[in-house]
Amino acid sequence: MAEATDVVLVGGGIMSATLGVLLKELEPSWEITLIERLEDVALESSNAWNNAGTGHSALCELNYAPLGADGVINPARALNIAEQFHVSRQFWATLVAEGKLEDNSFINAVPHMSLVMNEDHCRYLQKRYDVFKTQKLFENMEFSTDRNKISDWAPLIMRGRDENQPVAANYSAEGTDVDFGRLTRQMVKYLQGKGVKTEFNRHVEDIKRESDGAWVLKTADTRNPDWQLTLRTRFLFLGAGGGALTLLQKSGIPEGKGYGGLPVSGLFFRNSNPETAEQHNAKVYGQASVGAPPMSVPHLDTRNVDGKRHLMFGPYAGFRSNFLKQGSFMDLPLSIHMDNLYPMLRAGWANMPLTKYLLGELRKTKEERFASLLEYYPEANPDDWELITAGQRVQIIKKDSEKGGVLQFGTEIVAHADGSLAALLGASPGASTAVPLMIRLMHQCFPERAPSWEGRLKELVPGYGIKLNENPERADEIIAYTAKVLDI
């Protein structure tokens, strides 16, 4: 006998938690069930040590505004990401102010910096600063080539550095470090208090659609396959991180045809020595290597996890065929079907530099990896650093009318035409833009309900529908309000 519920959220990460809270705020009478394959929420990509914890607001990430072939830097993408992060930030602040989250401990003020180390990159960074400085959301950004000034911002990155090496840096005091695991747990605790059912250790075996339009999920307990649970719902969200592609394929919706995935693993060096960690308070992003994917941009970060400060450096990209950190090595081969084989082959052929890069990363020894860290922290002591494995990221491969198949970085919502099912594919900037992503998903899947949501959405996100970059006075009010509530 199937258990009926209005909404099923598959996956216990930041995306399902965000969508769950939004729906509970906008449709409090709807019954919601969240199911997770592991024993608790936020154990995969949302876990603090499975991501970099950067509040992605385009303050330091150079790949969001590259130098164009015409020599021009276009800030449009960076501004879009910054606007989205401020939507998330407003939503979190409202939940804290209304007492729906325990506290604001999930977010900390950590300055964001960009650091470059050759003359060409220094010229680029100066040009980027000149462009960004004219934008409201980046107006407080600082730039310097003065070694003493950069050392004031982040002493460890300059100590022991070659005096003849050209260096330049951007600095933004408004940066943040976010523990998305803690945020997810607080959100889910709130949902549980509102009657949302949470089912853990539940693996989705099958997804089928009935003649009346309802979706039926057959699940088995991972500890005992005989403990079956069947759910029947009118709306299904597949937000299982890297596992969303497999679930989308199980659903059989036509909109999901032609999608494939490239799993990319990440390694980081972590330093938990308090004497070292207390000397660095910044997220310092550099330039990606030629041929490297955007998510492999090296950065030396302050991390605040469970009340303790750490340093983290990476990522070092690698390849495992798992779609989830605790997934199966068969995830990739089993995801290859007739409808996505050609797009995957075409995308693979078109991205040979990426393939070579990943192979090169796989061959690196620990010492070779540590040499990259020394570029950002010249006096780093190998004894203070441990190599940890972060979460899996599954980059999107999709059909393309001209190229046959393309590899796409970023996130994408794939939804059934009638809005009864939606999946979120892809990765960065991911969690930082969870709130605008889920609002967009809700409007796409429930267009008839959207008008009735406007009032409450404007309470949850005070700047909802407003481009802060184009409304300076409103931007000042909202940014000051969220900074006060979140203590950032």
Swiss-Prot record:
Gene: mqo
E.C. number: 1.1.5.4
Enzyme class, first EC level, given as a word: oxidoreductase
Family matches, as Pfam families: Mqo
Matches recorded under PANTHER family: L-2-HYDROXYGLUTARATE DEHYDROGENASE, MITOCHONDRIAL (PTHR43104:SF2)
UniProt record similarity statement: Belongs to the MQO family.
Annotated SUPFAM superfamilies: FAD/NAD(P)-binding domain
Name of the protein described by the UniProt record: Probable malate:quinone oxidoreductase
Species assigned in the record: Neisseria gonorrhoeae (strain ATCC 700825 / FA 1090)
Gene3D superfamilies, sorted: D-Amino Acid Oxidase, subunit A, domain 2, FAD/NAD(P)-binding domain
